[in-house]
Amino acid sequence: MFIVREIFHLQFGRYREAKQLLDEAMKNQLLLQPQESRILTDFSGEGYRLILELPYETLAAYEADLKKELNETGWKEWYEKFKQLVRSSEREILKQVTKMGKNT
């Protein structure tokens, strides 16, 4: 299992606009939305971060979804609006080595 984290460092005070654009993109199926995906925001640390956390069984599955997303009709137009709210971004790809919790 791999966890892909798309981390967006937003411009100060632009969280609400960015969240509205994310909601719009999800409604219009412009973004990757594998089962058990999460949208996170900071509670501590550097402020104005928006994090998309995407679980994938394989990196090949992630690459296939990413290719599909980038070719989605309307994605480029949406992204042009979204990136105006972003100061910087980064991507983390993590390998899950064990699952913790009651249901393991």
Model-derived features with residue positions:
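Active-site-flanking beta-strand signature of metal-NTP-handling nucleotidyl enzymes
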Residues: 3-8
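Short hydrophobic/aromatic beta-strand micro-patches
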Residues: 9, 53-55
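An amphipathic, aromatic/His-enriched active-site/gating alpha helix that lines ligand/cofactor pockets
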Residues: 20, 24-38, 43, 55-93
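Short acidic/glycine-enriched loop/turn segments that link adjacent beta-strands
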Residues: 45-48
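Short, low-order "capping/linker" segments at domain edges
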Residues: 92-104
